[in-house]
């Protein structure tokens, strides 16, 4: 009697090319980001501020208008505006990301920029809070902001933290995309880093909150620093706050 479990299966009645007709075509290979970094040596700022959210991009908009400041580096992906690096103060740089970045590029971008070409002492990331990633109900008419820190930042003494007076992101809530990749990269390199997520995505009260955090914190004493007053939308597609790629 034949053993139906261990017996070799009979040959398929279909040809190989016939089976392939039911297989969806492979997605096209996306070109890797193109980095333009004219510096001979890695940059070593004391502070690197990364603006991902529309609010933070609006706040730093006066520093993104050419020819106000020279660009130190730029990184370009297909169908997106370039990521640019520019000086903000003598000791701090601004990395602006004006377009949504595909999730499969996030860790590659974070690894390319932090630790190789840019070696900061500390990193501050601004991103929007995604309602689909938040455990709880967000107020519709109230500005809120939370932070996540690396282990090195948590060990910093009071009065020396990057974001003073800001509550931690509630347990059970998640962060994804480029913001999470930057924070993970800083954790891997044992860098002091904080991620600030804010809500609503487009609101002047959030802009005022972030400006106050900066002027009373890491940018204290930078009186000549100009901040934007208009909330700009920077072409974010389909509202990043409502399309999470965490489980895709």
Task: Place the predicted regions along the sequence by residue.
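C-terminal folded domains that constitute the principal catalytic or ligand-binding module
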Residues: 136, 141-248
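N-terminal catalytic or cofactor-binding beta/alpha core of small enzyme domains
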Residues: 1-139, 188, 245-247
């Amino acid at each position: 009697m034949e053993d139906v479990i261990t017996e070799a299966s009979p040959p398929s009645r279909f040809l190989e090319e016939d089976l392939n007709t039911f297989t969806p075509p492979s997605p096209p290979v996306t070109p890797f980001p193109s980095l333009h970094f004219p510096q001979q040596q890695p940059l070593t700022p004391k502070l690197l501020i990364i603006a991902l959210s529309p609010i933070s991009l609006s706040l730093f908009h006066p520093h993104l208008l050419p020819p106000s400041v020279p660009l130190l580096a730029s990184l370009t992906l297909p169908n997106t505006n370039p990521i640019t690096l520019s000086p903000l103060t003598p000791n701090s740089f601004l990395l602006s990301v004006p377009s949504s970045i595909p999730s499969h590029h996030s860790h590659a971008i974070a690894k390319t920029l932090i630790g190789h070409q840019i070696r900061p002492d500390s990193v501050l990331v601004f991103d929007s809070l995604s309602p689909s990633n938040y455990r709880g109900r967000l107020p519709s008419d109230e500005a809120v902001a939370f932070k996540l820190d690396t282990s090195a930042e948590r060990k910093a003494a009071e009065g020396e933290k990057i974001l003073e007076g800001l509550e931690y992101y509630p347990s059970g809530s998640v962060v994804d995309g480029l913001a999470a990749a930057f924070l993970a990269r800083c954790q891997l390199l044992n860098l002091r880093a904080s991620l600030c997520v804010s809500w609503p995505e487009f609101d002047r009260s959030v802009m005022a909150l972030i400006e106050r955090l900066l002027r009373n914190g890491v940018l204290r004493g930078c009186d000549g620093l100009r901040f934007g007053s208009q909330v700009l939308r920077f072409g974010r597609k389909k509202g990043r706050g409502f399309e999470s790629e965490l489980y895709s």
